[in-house]
Regions:
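Rossmann-like NAD(P) dinucleotide-binding subdomain of oxidoreductase/dehydrogenase enzymes
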Residues: 1-71
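ALDH superfamily catalytic-core signature
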Residues: 44-150
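Alpha-helix termination/capping residues and helix-transition junctions
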Residues: 30, 92, 170-173
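Mature, solvent-exposed C-terminal subdomains and processed small-chain segments of exported/organellar
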Residues: 167-169, 182
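Residue-level signal for inorganic ion chemistry
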Residues: 36, 101, 164
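Residue-level detector of conserved catalytic or cofactor/ligand-binding positions
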Residues: 175-181
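Catalytic core of tubulin tyrosine ligase-like
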Residues: 160-161
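Conserved glycine-rich beta-strand-loop-beta hairpin in the small C-terminal domain of fold type I
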Residues: 145-152, 171-175
Length: 182
């Protein structure tokens, strides 16, 4: 791809040795780096911010949402949610929060709960989601913005796509840029 776009093929490099001393030394190479964009959990992001001597674009921790609209194929939605939540729980792009249109909550949530039982996923939700499925326990205010990295899923029921967008925008991870102080 680099060659096709007439970009130097050495512009992208892979460091195969993941030893912390090597990666920390790499983060200090102003002669090779213009910016770092760490993707991972809070510990990785904090380590890059604390050790880098080049600017860092902090992506924040992951609080990935899935919105299921009233027009969705429910079987497909269950499969997507199951995969996104349980395939690799410890990655920053794992689903942590589910937002569901109120018109499908009664059909979707019990079906989803049965599937998530295969992996013992704990479901934490608002009153509307609890009314639709007895397996859902109450969510706290902290649950909406939490990166669990665990078999836990928060669930919010909404009345419109606009309300879903507002909820997601309120609770997704923040992004900011840090300039090194050293």
């Amino acid at each position: 791809a680099l060659r096709a776009c007439k970009v130097d093929e050495d512009a992208i490099q892979l460091i195969e040795d993941t030893d912390r001393a090597i990666t920390t030394a790499f983060m200090k190479r102003k002669d090779f780096l213009d910016v770092l964009i760490p993707r991972g959990g809070a510990g990785l992001i904090r380590a890059v911010v604390e050790n880098s001597t080049v600017p860092v674009i902090e992506t924040g921790t992951g609080n990935c949402h899935i919105y299921v609209d009233e027009s969705a194929d429910l079987d497909m939605a269950v499969n997507i949610i199951f995969n996104a939540k349980t395939q690799r729980i410890g990655v920053c792009n794992a689903c942590e929060s589910l937002v569901v249109h109120e018109n499908i909550k009664d059909a979707l949530l019990p079906k989803l709960a049965e599937r998530l039982k295969e992996k013992n996923v704990e479901m934490r939700g608002d009153k509307a989601s609890q009314d639709a499925c007895s397996d859902i326990i109450p969510a706290s205010d902290e649950d909406w913005g939490k990166e669990y990295l665990d078999y836990i899923l928060s669930i919010k029921v909404v009345s419109s796509v606009e309300e879903a967008i507002a909820h997601i925008n309120k609770y997704l991870s923040l992004i900011h840029i840090s300039e090194p102080t050293r």
